[in-house]
């Protein structure tokens, strides 16, 4: 939800792993199924910290919360549409019944940061298939490159990287030489293009 346009809606307690034991309609119960155990915040710090970092990532990237509808075409004549949908192949969405994979490119030039500069582009890959899949990375205009930002696979949550500072040469490695990336099963991967 934190990567979607609009207002993200989290159920109270989601940020620290609260569960209603599979009950999706517990409004009429006044018992431990609906009570929030705030002590879990100290036991489930990994999830809570990850949600905080996702919120900070969302705030940093205005392309994730645009004030208008997206058109899926190049309305600014900048060479890229504001949003585009992809499959395992770049620019070729697969909407077949059995497809469990989708990638979304949000082009940063369509949303400005507070300082007036264009936001970074984001490439969000959803692999809900039960096996790893290879995804093409779309080419970015100019000298922009893809950098890994968020990964949701494995038993732990990866850290969102420290922002790249252009003055320092030490930075997270880009994927400039890669045209593809492998995404593990049932996971989401986000790349930042700058």
What do these predicted regions represent?
Residues 2-10, 14-194:
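Carbohydrate-interacting/catalytic domains
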């Amino acid at each position: 939800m934190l990567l979607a346009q609009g207002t993200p809606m989290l159920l109270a307690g989601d940020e620290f792993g609260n569960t209603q034991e599979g009950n999706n309609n517990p409004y009429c119960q006044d018992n431990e199924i609906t009570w929030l155990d705030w002590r879990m915040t100290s036991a489930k710090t990994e999830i809570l910290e990850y949600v905080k970092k996702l919120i900070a990532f969302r705030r940093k990237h205005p392309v994730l919360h645009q004030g208008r509808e997206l058109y899926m075409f190049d309305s600014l004549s900048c060479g890229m549409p504001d949003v585009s949908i992809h499959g395992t192949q770049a620019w070729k969405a697969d909407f077949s019944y059995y497809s469990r994979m989708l990638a979304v490119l949000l082009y940063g030039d369509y949303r400005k940061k507070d300082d007036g500069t264009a936001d970074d582009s984001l490439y969000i890959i959803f692999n809900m298939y039960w096996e790893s899949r290879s995804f093409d990375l779309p080419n970015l205009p100019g000298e922009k490159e893809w950098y890994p930002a968020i990964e949701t696979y494995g038993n732990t949550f990866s850290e969102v990287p420290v922002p790249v500072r252009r003055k320092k040469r030490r930075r997270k490695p880009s994927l400039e030489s890669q045209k593809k990336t492998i995404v593990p099963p049932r996971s989401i991967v986000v790349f930042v293009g700058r």
